[in-house]
Amino acid sequence: MLQQTQVATVIDYFEKFLDRFPNVQQLAQASQDDVLGLWSGLGYYSRARNLHRCAQAVFADYHGYFPQTALELTSLPGIGPSTAAAIASLCFNERVSILDGNVKRVVSRYLGFDRDLSAVANERALWSLADSLLPDQCSAADMPVYTQALMDLGATVCTRNQPKCNDCPFQSDCVAFASHKTALLPIKTRKLKRTSESHWVLVAHTVAGEVMLEKRPQKGIWAGLYALPMFDSYGALVQVLPAGQHVKAQTICPFVHVLTHKDLHLHPVVLQTPSSWAIAESVKWFAADQWAALGLPQPVRKLLQSLG
């Protein structure tokens, strides 16, 4: 949950999640809809899907017990090398280095590593250097302290902007500080290009207050979540409406929802109908008191709430 999300936002979600799924077995046996429903509002929903798949793998392949080495952990869905190393080090005391964003910054500056980390080979080279920095005399019980200290150093002292070098215990040996290159390191030139998409969103609701929602495909925007049906154009939306209903449709003010590397321009089209009807097998109608249990994307939830 803490990946890409601030602690203050996560706390409430974390507590509710553990209340509902107190162990691996209960999470593994839950439906994806239940998991996504509790995740709704946090964003980055692939984290929830991967966590669910990971629990299923641990329950099925490891009898409900997490593997304890970084190598084994990387075989689980959603766990990459750095996350695996962090779990192995912090939870099971394995002598292994991690390389999350904070640690990359600390190690790059400390050693003056000036290769572009956009290249896989260069990141591997930095990882080897991080391995070489592991304490020789470190006991197993000390590994969680070492790992957490490096992450905290990057998060609070060796920050991306305006690092607090005078507070850093490594200042006297730091190559970047000595060469006045702190602001230049680490180097990563390749960035994902921002894109934008426009979608017309059908907000169809009955007189009784039921709203049409569609289960999104397992790939793409809001994969696996329930959302309002979306179309590439107003014309495509109108084509699915019952005969004569398009004249009752009301277009309301469009808005932009910002994803990590994509801007969604959403154009809501509101239509009140006397009774429910279907445009596809993936569509269902839900009353307002059912929304809380669904995995609804944040903009969909806000739009529905704003319309009462």
Identify the role of each PLM range.
Residues 2-164, 170-183, 196, 246, ...:
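Catalytic cores of DNA base-excision repair glycosylases
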Residues 1-2, 296:
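Intrinsically disordered, low-complexity regions enriched for glutamine and histidine
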Residues 152-308:
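Intrinsically disordered, low-complexity, charged terminal extensions of DNA damage-control enzymes
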